[in-house]
Amino acid sequence: DDFGSKTLYLKIIYVDYELHFCVIELIGEWNDAIENDIMMLKREIGDELMKKGISKFIFIAENVLNFHSSDNEYYREWYDEVSDEEGWIIILNMPAATQQDFIKKKLPYYMELMELPEWRSYKPYHLFTKIDTELRQRIS
């Protein structure tokens, strides 16, 4: 669905207001350099979900075929906001070629890259608990 970007689209697959998480699939070209997609994604989707208590975001990015970076201002801002609520942002299954610019700009500090090719075999709750458990184990 359209959220304001000319090149990146998304589908909100699932939202759990009790456990404060959502699963969103991204499709297309993520272009911060020209379109400032992260600003639109944060303002139009992230901020609206956070107003409703969502602090844990799972973005499935296996169909994001290109990534063009700019600065990290909105990544940092979003990271700070979800961290204040003990939340996190995960980018799941971003293609290796797409990850290069993402990693070069050190954006995984704000949105962690994770691989889980079989994500479709999980119900949303089980996908969330698997990711959340893995993140908690890394911290401890």
Predicted feature locations:
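Amphipathic, Lys/Arg-enriched alpha-helical "gate/interface" segment within cytosolic domains
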Residues: D1-G4, Y9-Y17, C22-N63, F67-S140
